[in-house]
Amino acid sequence: MIKLIRTNSHIQYNYAQKKAYEVLLKYSDGVLPIDPFRIIKKINNIELKTYTEFAKELQKKHPSMSIEEIKCQFESDRGFLKKKGKKKYILCYNEEDSIYIIRWTIFHELGHYFLEHLKEEYSYIFCDGERYNEIKEKEANCFARHCSSPLPLALYMYVEINNNNLKLLDLFRYFFNMSKEVSEYCSNHFSTHWKYYIVEKNDNLITLF
């Protein structure tokens, strides 16, 4: 198995964005809002499970524990990605969350998958483990932001189609099916960095949708 080793503590925002657009071009069906469930179905080595489904599997090995007791041991209240053998993965999400949170969670965990965070070997340059985890979380969030609402497409829709009639926050909520919280997160980033997304290399992405 190839292990990736980080040589610095830089957050690879550009790489996460680039990878998100590559994933959309390869796996998306070009329909809005972008459906992470449909993307996962096209990835052969990821098994998608709810928290309850995964807890029931684990209960077979730990029959003395209840489903809820097992869930309490999960590393996150939202979702997580785990390796299963050498080449397969399990992506679990909390089915009790709203559909908005579930979608974001899956995009986020797909970020960990496509950015190969689970293949990384711990590097001693990260003496602070919290900093190392923070970097990976920010990269996964960056991937999720661009994969769930590709900003070159948002810019095109906002300027060319919408003609600025719809508020930016509402554009993210209605066209990309995001919660108010995530819409604010994406629209704030968009407002600050929108000029960065006016480039011809994104034409294929816009054409896809």
Kindly label every feature range from the protein language model.
Residues 1-209:
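Active-site hotspot residues in diverse enzymes, especially metal/ion-binding acidic/histidine motifs
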